[in-house]
Amino acid sequence: MNADWLHAIEEKLTRLKDRGSFRQLVPTSEAALPWLTRENCRLLNLASNNYLGIADSKEFIERTEQLASSYAIGSTASRLIIGNHPLYEEAEYELTKWKKTEAALIFGSGYMANVGIISSIVGRGDAVFSDKLNHASIVDGCQLSRADHLRFRHNDMDHLETLLQKSPHKQKLIVVDALFSMDGDHANLHDLVTLKERYGAILMVDEAHSGGVYGATGGGLVEELGLNDRVDIQMGTFSKALGSYGGYVAGAKPFIEYLLNHARSLIFTTALPPYIVASHLAALQIVQEQPWRREKVQVLGERLRNGLEQLGFSLCGSESYIVPVLIGDNHDLLLVSESLQAAGIAAIPVRPPTVPRGEGRIRLTVTASHTEKDIDWAIEQFQRLPLVGRRELTP
């Protein structure tokens, strides 16, 4: 074993600990439920991306098992070899109907989808215009593409237009999260569509955190705003509101065929197991049949936001069921997290580099499995915190 190498790693770990940025895995049970178990403590689960409460639904599990009953556990190969089992075609057909596009393609994960899409459609001599707060998978896709990576200030359409005006690039790709995972606010999709049409760009929207919850059928923010025909690429995941695992992209048929021949993160990996793809089908059915789930999570999200705002907490401009409580300094953040977990809330600290330095936060998420009583109790626990991360309110 190379002792110098290990010593260098240990020094880096020590620096992480000194900054309060060291991370560890913590065994967690019942993570799909409203209350979970972590380090032998029962905690209110405000840390899950299971927004619609589907992952723990008995109906979801039963439908999935029925659809997958005649298949083996493993897919045995990549999709382009023999791993493209019939459930893939069924699920992708349902995706095209749901997203109102010509075609769709399922990837192994949302991360793999973003990396594969972006690195396939742009390259040297092209440019990607990316919101500063886009997910790491988008950033990594931009870097792998070798295109010029031009980041615009968060939701700043004037800055984006300035960059587009100055761009000499032939191929221009604009990519944004529809709902930003660490701030809980929305992209300005109407303005983005206008700019992409004005400057001849391609627009890619990542619906990872909005898919399933927004729109008449849960199709996402693009559907809710009626922009299906004007957004070129709709990407999303099955791992959040849809309660399963995997990523997807929907768009024009030639584009999907192009990805099938160029996206390395699809071509050079084993296909998802049939059971997982069966769960995609089951989730798509439930999302469209049960609108009460998305209605409930929106109402509960508003209830939590209102309660915390009244206590003086900064919520990063959240307008959704993702409710980040801004604390700031890492050490203060860890103290708040420990206090909340001692009170009975799974309050997971989010630190740099996931968020900008000095903007550490407790990222709270609401699901349709929660009750009003759960939310009100959580607000009470925040009220008991010392004045860290919130302003003092005048009477």
Curated annotation (Swiss-Prot):
Specify whether Repressor is a keyword of the entry.
Answer: no
Q: Which residues carry this modification: N6-(pyridoxal phosphate)lysine?
A: K240
Q: Output one GO BP term.
A: biotin biosynthetic process
**Alphabetized SUPFAM superfamilies for the sequence:** PLP-dependent transferases (SSF53383)
* Keywords on record: Biotin biosynthesis, Pyridoxal phosphate, Transferase
**Which Pfam family would be a valid example here?**
Aminotran_1_2
Q: One GO MF term, please?
A: pyridoxal phosphate binding
Pathway, per Swiss-Prot/TrEMBL? Cofactor biosynthesis; biotin biosynthesis
The reaction(s) catalysed by this protein are: 6-carboxyhexanoyl-[ACP] + L-alanine + H(+) = (8S)-8-amino-7-oxononanoate + holo-[ACP] + CO2
Q: Where is the signal peptide?
A: none
Which Gene3D superfamilies does this one have? Aspartate Aminotransferase, domain 1, Type I PLP-dependent aspartate aminotransferase-like (Major domain)
- Has UniProt tagged this entry with the keyword Transcription regulation? no
Q: State the top-level EC class.
A: transferase
EC number per UniProt:
2.3.1.47
User: For substrate, which residues are the binding ones?
Assistant: R23, H135, T354
Residue positions annotated to bind pyridoxal 5'-phosphate are G110, Y111, S181, D206, E207, A208, H209, T237, F238, S239, K240
Necessary cofactors: pyridoxal 5'-phosphate
Record's NCBIfam families? Answer: bioF
Family note? Belongs to the class-II pyridoxal-phosphate-dependent aminotransferase family. BioF subfamily.
Q: Which PANTHER family match?
A: 8-AMINO-7-OXONONANOATE SYNTHASE, CLASS II AMINOTRANSFERASE/8-AMINO-7-OXONONANOATE SYNTHASE
Q: How does it assemble?
A: Homodimer.
Main function: Catalyzes the decarboxylative condensation of pimeloyl-[acyl-carrier protein] and L-alanine to produce 8-amino-7-oxononanoate (AON), [acyl-carrier protein], and carbon dioxide.
Specify the protein name.
Answer: Putative 8-amino-7-oxononanoate synthase
Q: Which gene encodes it?
A: bioF
